[in-house]
C-alpha cells in the first residue's frame, strides 16, 4: 500500500513535467528510532515514519533510501501534532506568524473564534493566512457575539428581535460558507450575556443544518452553573449536532467536589445520544475580565463583590495581568493592591473595576485582565480524566496566564508522568486524535498513512511546562522537533524559517 501511495506522488511529478505545471517538492523525510504513539491511545511501538510531501506515507520498520532526509529520533516519543481546540491565537497571529508559544508546546493546529468572538469576516482572515502562512494550521468558529455586534451594534444590551435573529442567521450562513467549523458562544460575556435561549438555539439550529458544530463558554461557570449545563445539553438534544463545553470547570466553592455528579449527568446525556464533550486546561486558575465576576455589571454592588471574595476568587488568588490605567498593578494580587491603596480588598475591587470601565469608555481598549483562583484540584483531575475531555490552552500568543505557553507540556510532564492521572498514551490521545474527532477532522490527529504529517518529537522523561504567573512566557522544555504538513518548523528545540501552516476549513455537510 505504501509503495502504491509513493508511486502516486511520483507520478504527479511526472505529470507536472508533461503539462508544464510547477513541480511539487517531495520533502521525503524518514524518522527512525522513535517510540511511536499514534494518537489512538494504543501502546507505543518502536519504529519509523516516512513523510512524502505533506502526508505520512508509511509507518513501521522502514529502510532508508538515498532520497530520504534521515532524522534519528534517538528513542524519543513521536506523536501526532497537538490540536488546541480552544485558542485565542487569532488576536495576534497575523503579526506573530511564528506562533512561538504554540509551536514550543508541540501544537500544530489551533482552533480560534472562541468565546463568541471571531475575526470578521472570516473570509478575509483566511485569505490573509493563505497569502502569508503562519507556522501552524488554523481553523475557526463563527462567534455569536461577533454576529450580534454586526447586526445590533456594539454595546447593545437588549434581547434580539425575530428580525435581528434572522439577520444574524444570514451572516452565520455566510461565515459557515467560508469554512467555519461551527458556532461558538461566550454567554458569560457581553453581548452574549443579554441573549435569550431562543436566540442561541435558533443560531445553533442553523449551524446544525449546515453540518457545523457548537462550542460554548457557558452562560455561567459559577452561580448558575447547573442551568448552563442544562442549556448546552438541550442544544445538543434539539439540534442533534456535536456540542462542546469550553474549558470545563467548577469555579465556585459551593460546586467544589461535585465533578462526579457533573460527569454522571454528561454521561447520561451521551447515553441519550447527545454528542457532548469538553475541553480543559490544566490549571486551577483562569484569566478574564473583572466584570465577568459581576453578572449585573455593577461595580458598586458591594454585596455581589463580597460574594466574589468569599465564593468565586479569594483576594490573594486574584492577580492582575493587564491594567493600563495603572500598569504598576500588573503582577500584583488584589491583597497587595488594596494594601497600597489603604483599602479593603472589596473596596479596591470596586474602585479598580470603575477605573477599568472608565479606561475602556475613553480608549475603546480593554481596561483589565485578571487571573482568578477558583477551582479545586480534585475536580480538575476528575474533569480532565473524563474520556470525552480533550486538552486545550484557552491562551493567545501574548497571554499572561501560563496556560498560553504551558498547557500541553504540563499535562504530559505533570499529570501523566508525575501524578500518573492517566497514561502517556492517553494524554497524547487527549491532545491529538480525540480533539480531531471532536472537530470532525478526518486527516489529522493520528499517525497513519494518508494523514497529514503534523508531528511532534518529545522526551517523555523531561517534558514539562515552565511558565508561571510571574513569568508567563517561559517556553516548555522537552519538546524537540515539530513538523507541520510535513515541514519541520522546530528542530532540536529551535524554530526553523519555515511557515507551512494552512487554513483548515469545515468539510462536513448536513
Language model segments and positions:
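Bacterial N-terminal signal peptides
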Residues: 10-22
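Bacterial N-terminal signal peptides that target proteins for export
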Residues: 1-12
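C-terminal cap of metal-dependent C-N hydrolases
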Residues: 301-302, 310, 381-388, 393-394, ...
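Polyanionic/metal-chelating signatures
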Residues: 122-130, 145-161, 187, 208, ...
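Divalent metal-binding pocket/active-site signature
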Residues: 174-232
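Divalent-metal coordination cores built from histidine and acidic residues
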Residues: 73-78, 82-87, 94-185, 204, ...
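Acidic, glycine-enriched loop/beta-strand segments at the rims
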Residues: 36-48, 364-375, 380, 422-428, ...
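Histidine-rich, glycine-flanked metal-binding segment
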Residues: 36-81
Amino acid at each position: 500500500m505504501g509503495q502504491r501511495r509513493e508511486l502516486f506522488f511520483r507520478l504527479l511529478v511526472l505529470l507536472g513535467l508533461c503539462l508544464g505545471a510547477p513541480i511539487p517538492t517531495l520533502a521525503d523525510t524518514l524518522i527512525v528510532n522513535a517510540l511511536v504513539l499514534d494518537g489512538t491511545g494504543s501502546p507505543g511501538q518502536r519504529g519509523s515514519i516516512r513523510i512524502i510531501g505533506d502526508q505520512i506515507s508509511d509507518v513501521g520498520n522502514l529502510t532508508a533510501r538515498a532520497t530520504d532526509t534521515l532524522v534519528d529520533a534517538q528513542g524519543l516519543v513521536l506523536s501526532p501534532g497537538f490540536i488546541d481546540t480552544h485558542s485565542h491565537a487569532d488576536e495576534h497571529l497575523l503579526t506573530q506568524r511564528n506562533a512561538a508559544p504554540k509551536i514550543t508546546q508541540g501544537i500544530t493546529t489551533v482552533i480560534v473564534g472562541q468565546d463568541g468572538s471571531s475575526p470578521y469576516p472570516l473570509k478575509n482572515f483566511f485569505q490573509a493566512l493563505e497569502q502569508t502562512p503562519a507556522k501552524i494550521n488554523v481553523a475557526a468558529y463563527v462567534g455569536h457575539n461577533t454576529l450580534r455586534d454586526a447586526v445590533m451594534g456594539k454595546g447593545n444590551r437588549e434581547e434580539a428581535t425575530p428580525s435581528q435573529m434572522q439577520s444574524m442567521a444570514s451572516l452565520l450562513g455566510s461565515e459557515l460558507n467560508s469554512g467555519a467549523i461551527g458556532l461558538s458562544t461566550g454567554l458569560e460575556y457581553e453581548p452574549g450575556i443579554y441573549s435569550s435561549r431562543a436566540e442561541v438555539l435558533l443560531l445553533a439550529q442553523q449551524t446544525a443544518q449546515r453540518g457545523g458544530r457548537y462550542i460554548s463558554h457557558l452562560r455561567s461557570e459559577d452561580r448558575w452553573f447547573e442551568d448552563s449545563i442544562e442549556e448546552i445539553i438541550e442544544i445538543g438534544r434539539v439540534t442533534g449536532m456535536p456540542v462542546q463545553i469550553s474549558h470545563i470547570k467548577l469555579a465556585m466553592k459551593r460546586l467544589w467536589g461535585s465533578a462526579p455528579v457533573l460527569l454522571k449527568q454528561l454521561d447520561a446525556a451521551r447515553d441519550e445520544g447527545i454528542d457532548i464533550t469538553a475541553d480543559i486546561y490544566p490549571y486551577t486558575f483562569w484569566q478574564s475580565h473583572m466584570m465577568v465576576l459581576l453578572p449585573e455589571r455593577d461595580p458598586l454592588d458591594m454585596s455581589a463583590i463580597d460574594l466574589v471574595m468569599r465564593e468565586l476568587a479569594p483576594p490573594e488568588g486574584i492577580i492582575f495581568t493587564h491594567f493600563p490605567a495603572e500598569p504598576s498593578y500588573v503582577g500584583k494580587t488584589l491583597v497587595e493592591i488594596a494594601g497600597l491603596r489603604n483599602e479593603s480588598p472589596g473596596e479596591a475591587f470596586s474602585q479598580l473595576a470603575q477605573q477599568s470601565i472608565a479606561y475602556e469608555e475613553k480608549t475603546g481598549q480593554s481596561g483589565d485582565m485578571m487571573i482568578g483562583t477558583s477551582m479545586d484540584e480534585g475536580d480538575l483531575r476528575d474533569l480532565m480524566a473524563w474520556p470525552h475531555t480533550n486538552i486545550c490552552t484557552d491562551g493567545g500568543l501574548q497571554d499572561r496566564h501560563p496556560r498560553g505557553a504551558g498547557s500541553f507540556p504540563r499535562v504530559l510532564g505533570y499529570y501523566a508522568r508525575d501524578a500518573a492521572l492517566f497514561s502517556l498514551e492517553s494524554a497524547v490521545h487527549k491532545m491529538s486524535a480525540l480533539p480531531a474527532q471532536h472537530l470532525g477532522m478526518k486527516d489529522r490527529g493520528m499517525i497513519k498513512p494518508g494523514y497529514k504529517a503534523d508531528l511532534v518529537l518529545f522526551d517523555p522523561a523531561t517534558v514539562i511546562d515552565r511558565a508561571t504567573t510571574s513569568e508567563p512566557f517561559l517556553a516548555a522544555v522537552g519538546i524537540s522537533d515539530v513538523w507541520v504538513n510535513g515541514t519541520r518548523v522546530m528542530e532540536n528545540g529551535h524554530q526553523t524559517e519555515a511557515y507551512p501552516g494552512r487554513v483548515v476549513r469545515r468539510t462536513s455537510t448536513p
